[in-house]
Amino acid sequence: MVSVDVVGAAGVPALWYILKQNQAPSGMVYSGCLILPFTNSFFTLQLMCMETGITGIREAIVMDRFIASGVSIRELSESATRFEHGTAKGHYSPDAPEHDVQFPNHPLSRVRRYFRDVLSVLSIKGVY
């Protein structure tokens, strides 16, 4: 899991999460899912972006920047073993949103950007 958040979607509180899964033969698929709960049902909107071409560039560049900043490999590996609420805590996080601006065509950046676009125009008609 990359992230999970409660967001406002057309005036309704909703759950938004992003999953990262391996794809064959290489690369990752990033899947964003918006779940809108209603009285007797729920609505799910899913958006998937796949990695194509050369993969791992975002991760390699972010890692290189952390190493260049003086963070040791040992610190990175030790921080990856610390968990808080089921999520690894540490310095190295190539999936963090702050890297999206540097990698706008990365599938994770696109999932987040498309999700913001959907939220900006989403409307719900009728009573559910």
Regions found by a protein language model. Give the residues of each.
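Signature of long, low-cysteine stretches enriched in small and polar/charged residues
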Residues: 1-43, 47-55, 59-60
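Surface-exposed amphipathic alpha-helical segments
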Residues: 49-128
